[in-house]
Amino acid sequence: MNLEALLDTVPAYARDLKLNFSAVVRQNTELTEQQLWGTVVACAAASRNRTLLDAIVEEAKGKLSAQAVEAAKGAAAILSMNNIFYRFQHLAVNKKYETMRAGLRMNFLRQHGVDPLDFELWALAVSAVNGCGKCIDAHERVLLQKEFSEEKILAAIRVASTIYGLAVVFDAEEPKGDLVGAPVNTDAYSTTTI
């Protein structure tokens, strides 16, 4: 399903999210197309709703290079890992963890092949979705040091929050039932007692 058709299925209780999508994505004036659509793709991937991600990636292919689409998905992947690790360090009462080596590969942070500031913005947005304050502060600091404006940062966070909200709506509205291709446990439906 294309993105517009998917957005047309947004129920009345989530109308604000559909309107926000129009305002922060369709009517965006703060971010470049790559900054915007990379943020949209990265946040959709981090929000983990397959229906929304598929529709967004399909539309993004007309706005981003294939490399940028992959880099945005890569930002969601590597930052989701980092967000868990660094959020643990930040929240743990035992501060010794902050002095210990991460021991996790993070090469993609330097090998994504897109503008480093754009990638940094996507990393910040994914960190907001995943709720890692330590990562939010680190990525915001890099952007501000490179004279990236707070208005642009907040524009990306508006996108992140809207995409996450839409993912929640589509999760809530997706029909439930057996997973396609998964074996069905017929014993669960048996009326015979053992």
UniProtKB/Swiss-Prot annotation:
SUPFAM superfamilies: AhpD-like (SSF69118). Coiled coil: none annotated. Its EC number is 1.11.1.28. It comes from the Bacteria. It catalyses: N(6)-[(R)-dihydrolipoyl]-L-lysyl-[lipoyl-carrier protein] + a hydroperoxide = N(6)-[(R)-lipoyl]-L-lysyl-[lipoyl-carrier protein] + an alcohol + H2O. Disulfide bonds join C132-C135. GO terms for biological process: cell redox homeostasis; response to oxidative stress. Keywords: Antioxidant, Disulfide bond, Oxidoreductase, Peroxidase, Redox-active center. The keyword rRNA processing does not apply. It is an enzyme of class 1 (oxidoreductase). One of its GO terms (molecular function) is peroxiredoxin activity. The keyword Oxidoreductase applies. Transmembrane segments: none annotated. The active site is at C132 (proton donor), C135 (cysteine sulfenic acid (-soh) intermediate). It holds the Pfam family CMD. Belongs to the AhpD family. Antioxidant protein with alkyl hydroperoxidase activity. Required for the reduction of the AhpC active site cysteine residues and for the regeneration of the AhpC enzyme activity. This is Alkyl hydroperoxide reductase AhpD. It comes from Koribacter versatilis (strain Ellin345).
